């Protein structure tokens, strides 16, 4: 037989022979495949929509033109479904429901600055790159993802609030940021025209300093009683009719969320006490100082109470 029965055309590749003693001086055949200099990677549309802050291999020290800046993490047409509630519902306040062209440009710049502010406070909270026991993302597998979903849900509810509620929150956040600016005209101008940066600055300030009643625990029964009374009064003030409004409920939005949030709160209090005495004492001093600056500037009685009971001051800073 000339060839085996199972052999088909193209089954065996032809041998490519270079220069040998049996062949002529032919050009050697290169077996290496040519590759392009630019390596491209296909990114799924869903992954691109929910990407995190920042990208690997991008030099953020060299700013791009504002018109070429593209929003990452959510839709470029509106800031309605971001990663945190402080980014939501700021630029949808318009007579027709749609922001103007100038507002869209300012929206991009405001969000760009807010992301930078957020990164600064993250580095301040974790200066050595290692998270402490104060981290509140979760203690078991799956809780971190649940927290991210909860934050996006909170951002969605934040954008659904009435216009008067959102405006009141913007003006209150601006007032607090003016106080924390300590007379810096440049920061005051930024907080005046950039509501997203103001809300992010306020949230990052409280988070980095630890001025929250979740991490500042009462030292005795009397302090616990006073701090609980302050929290009850603030909740009653924000929900005067007894019915929680859209975006005001912090316990959850589905069955089982409330219990999971309570367990997470107790775990956060436990982890906060595992830090060094210097960190615990520093959070107490920062809570008292922050509450006096923002809420008790001219009342000597409240200042005395806030300096005496740090957990009460942290309850003021929470709401």
UniProtKB/Swiss-Prot annotation:
Assigned GO CC terms: chloroplast thylakoid membrane; phycobilisome
Positions contributing to phycourobilin 3 binding: 299
Residue sites binding (2R,3E)-phycoerythrobilin per the record: 212
Binding site for phycourobilin 1: 96
Binding site for phycourobilin 2: 135
Gene Ontology annotations of biological process type: photosynthesis
Free-text description of this protein's post-translational modifications in UniProt: Contains four covalently linked bilin chromophores.
Assembly, per entry: Heteromer of 4 alpha, 4 beta and one gamma chains.
UniProt name for this protein: R-phycoerythrin gamma chain, chloroplastic
